[in-house]
């Protein structure tokens, strides 16, 4: 299988082909996901919760993400590798450049950052300097205390319009990929149709171009809070690689996410 690039994902969107993404944090799991055909792997700051045992993602450092990015890079040959910029590691344009440099040098193909219009200058500067950007809007976990918890965003008309405007502005600034999290399916569909870049959903209905889940949720090994939008594929398959294939197949045929994983 040929290597996945941002151009590959654009082609998928244009052809209407759904693609898949999973988080990964080490070489062994990354190699398994890569060989089964997962298109995008994310070294997410979710590692703060699922690996380090924190209540949220805020304690994760640039060094943490860089370490796990190097680990994942060694295990893959096909998937596009994205690395999260951790909390407060991109508060200014200059800081964003420094953090992105460290993660790209660790092996990332793209960096992901959370937020809306305040990020536009950073997205523009990264793009101008050859760093591919994935933006993340909707429920942004690094802002969990501002939101008052992990809550669905964009349910009222004003906030829905704000999120749509953010998506358009981030694309115009140069973002090549967008993650939208925990928003109503109708809003996710509107964003996906309004943008020319690929849109990945998590808790955002089935009409996005791609779907991403945390690997621990897919394998049923998460402790504590289990998001409504997740699905334990290991329970129905009994084997890790089969679980990954089931996730890929259900995204491809549109059966995941189902109504039980979707917000209105």
Swiss-Prot record:
Q: What is its main location?
A: cytoplasm
Query: Might you give the EC number(s) for this enzyme?
Result: 2.1.2.11
Where does the chain bind Mg(2+)?
Answer: 45, 84, 114
Could you give the cofactor binding note from the entry? Binds 1 Mg(2+) ion per subunit.
Q: Which GO terms describe its biological process?
A: pantothenate biosynthetic process
Keyword terms: Cytoplasm, Magnesium, Metal-binding, Pantothenate biosynthesis, Transferase
Where is it localised?
Cytoplasm
Query: Which cofactors, if any, are listed as required?
Result: Mg(2+)
Which is one Pfam family of this protein?
Pantoate_transf
- Any single Gene Ontology cellular-component annotation: cytoplasm
Q: Which residues form a coiled coil?
A: none
Its pathway is: Cofactor biosynthesis; (R)-pantothenate biosynthesis; (R)-pantoate from 3-methyl-2-oxobutanoate: step 1/2
The molecular function GO annotations come to: 3-methyl-2-oxobutanoate hydroxymethyltransferase activity; magnesium ion binding
Class in the EC hierarchy, top level: transferase
Q: Which reaction does it catalyse?
A: 3-methyl-2-oxobutanoate + (6R)-5,10-methylene-5,6,7,8-tetrahydrofolate + H2O = 2-dehydropantoate + (6S)-5,6,7,8-tetrahydrofolate
Active-site residues per Swiss-Prot or TrEMBL entry: 181 (proton acceptor)
Locate the residues binding 3-methyl-2-oxobutanoate: 45-46, 84, 112
According to the record's subunit comment, the protein's assembly and interactions are: Homodecamer; pentamer of dimers.
Free-text function comment from the UniProt entry: Catalyzes the reversible reaction in which hydroxymethyl group from 5,10-methylenetetrahydrofolate is transferred onto alpha-ketoisovalerate to form ketopantoate.
Record family assignment: Belongs to the PanB family.
State the protein's name.
Answer: 3-methyl-2-oxobutanoate hydroxymethyltransferase
């Amino acid at each position: 299988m040929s290597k996945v690039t941002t151009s590959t994902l654009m082609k998928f969107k244009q052809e209407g082909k759904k693609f898949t993404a999973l988080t990964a944090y080490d070489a062994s799991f990354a190699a398994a996901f890569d060989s089964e055909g997962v298109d995008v792997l994310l070294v997410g700051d979710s590692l703060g919760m699922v690996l380090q045992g924190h209540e949220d993602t805020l304690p994760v450092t640039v060094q943490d993400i860089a370490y796990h990015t190097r680990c994942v890079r060694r295990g893959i040959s096909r998937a596009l590798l994205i690395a999260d910029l951790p909390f407060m590691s991109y508060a200014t344009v200059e800081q964003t450049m420094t953090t992105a440099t460290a993660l790209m040098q660790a092996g990332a193909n793209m960096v992901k950052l959370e937020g809306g219009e305040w990020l536009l200058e950073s997205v523009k500067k990264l793009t101008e300097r050859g760093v591919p950007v994935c933006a993340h809007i909707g429920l942004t976990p690094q802002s969990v205390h501002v939101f008052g918890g992990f809550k669905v965003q964009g349910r009222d008309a004003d906030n829905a319009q704000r999120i749509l405007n953010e998506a358009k502005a981030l694309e115009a600034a140069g973002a090549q990929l967008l993650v939208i999290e925990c928003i109503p399916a109708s809003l996710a569909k509107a964003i996906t149709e309004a943008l020319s870049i690929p849109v990945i959903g998590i808790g955002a209905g089935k009409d996005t171009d791609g779907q991403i889940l945390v690997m621990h949720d897919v394998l049923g090994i998460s402790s504590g809070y289990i998001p409504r939008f997740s699905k334990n594929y290991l329970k129905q398959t009994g084997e890790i690689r089969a679980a990954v294939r089931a996730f890929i197949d259900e995204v491809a045929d549109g059966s995941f996410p189902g109504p039980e994983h979707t917000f209105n």
